[in-house]
Amino acid sequence: MLEGIRIVEIEGLGPTPFAGMMFADLGAEVTVIHRKDKSIFSNPKNILDRGKRSIELDLKDPKDLEIAKKIIFRSDALIEGFRPGVMENFGLGPDDLNENPLLVYGRMTGWGQNCLLYTSPSPRDATLSRMPSSA
């Protein structure tokens, strides 16, 4: 169904790895950029990585960042789920990647891009537990 579509997934939590898995299940070529520090998410037995290619990069390293950009520029879509500003700090925000004007940039954040809750210094779970609807 999605054969020939290339998607880059930036390793993260929440809906992003699920979306990447679904895209891969539907035939897309999904490449996950894992953290080089061997995070818990880059476990080779992680079911969410089924059908995906992967590469470990340190996006704070200029050489690795250039490799990531080359992969992204050859892709049809990018998906990520970081807090607002994180990808921009890496130089990988939507405005930074306009070298590929056809790139579909998918953001899947818990609070959207403009919600005041994302500025909370506490972890997301603690923020969620303070909300009346989750008590």
Indicate where each model-derived feature is located:
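N-terminal helix-loop segment corresponding to the beta1-alpha1 unit
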Residues: 1-120
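Single conserved hydrophobic/aromatic residue that forms the stacking wall/gate
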Residues: 118-121, 125-135
